[in-house]
């Protein structure tokens, strides 16, 4: 069962959205680098990483032919439910499903039927890829903050990259292991 998602407005919409996200990301990263107020820095970094999730979403859903090799999604030898529980993924999952972020992607929640399991399994791959793209973009911001000796901005950047990209990637892999052990 293959499910495709159409992006509103087609390729032009995606290009315009990318352009807008790029401009916003640049100004947010500059503001993060220059601010001395920690709470403002924290809020700006959150917005910056929320934008990186947008890059991943629009790239993956607009251009599904550029997918990652299926080998990437296969369970690795070291992966088990215990491994992910040790990393705190179950704790993260419980916090996520009780937060406002649960409203962002309603497609990923099962509706109690076996027919939805395949759709959910494929959706975990889409979500993981979107967050992987965000994680890689976040690494660029880490390098930029390090190059400018903005270590407080770097620490906020690392925190949000972990919470908004790395842990969601781990959660998607954890969910696939639960579905197909």
Regions found by a protein language model. Give the residues of each.
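Transmembrane alpha-helical segments that form the membrane-embedded catalytic/substrate-channel core
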Residues: 49-65, 162-174
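Membrane-proximal soluble regions of multi-pass membrane proteins
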Residues: 61-120, 177
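Hydrophobic alpha-helical transmembrane segments of multipass integral membrane proteins
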Residues: 18-21, 132-142, 158, 162
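Transmembrane alpha-helical segments and their cytosolic interface motifs
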Residues: 119-149
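Structural signature of transmembrane alpha-helix termini at the membrane-water interface
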Residues: 23, 27, 58, 140-147, ...
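Helix-coil boundary and interhelical linker segments in multi-pass alpha-helical membrane proteins
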Residues: 29-35, 144-152
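Cytosolic-side membrane-entry/anchor segment at the start of a transmembrane helix
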Residues: 1-50, 170-180
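Hydrophobic core segments of alpha-helical transmembrane domains in multi-pass membrane proteins
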Residues: 40-49, 141, 153-162
């Amino acid at each position: 069962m293959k499910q495709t998602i159409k992006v509103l407005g087609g390729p032009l919409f995606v290009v315009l959205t990318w352009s807008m996200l790029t401009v916003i990301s640049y100004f947010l990263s500059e503001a993060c680098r220059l601010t001395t107020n920690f709470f403002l820095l924290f809020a700006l970094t959150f917005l910056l990483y929320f934008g990186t999730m947008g890059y991943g979403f629009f790239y993956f859903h607009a251009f599904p032919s550029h997918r990652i090799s299926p080998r990437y999604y296969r369970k690795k030898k070291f992966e088990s439910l215990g491994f992910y529980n040790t990393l705190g993924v179950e704790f993260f999952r419980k916090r996520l499903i009780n937060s406002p972020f649960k409203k962002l992607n309603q497609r990923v929640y099962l509706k109690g039927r076996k027919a939805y399991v395949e759709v959910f399994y494929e959706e975990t791959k889409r979500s993981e890829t979107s967050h992987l793209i965000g994680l890689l973009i976040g690494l660029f911001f880490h390098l930029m903050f390090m190059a400018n000796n903005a270590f407080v901005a770097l620490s906020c950047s690392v925190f949000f990259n972990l919470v908004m990209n790395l842990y969601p990637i781990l959660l998607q892999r954890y969910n696939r292991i639960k579905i197909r052990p």
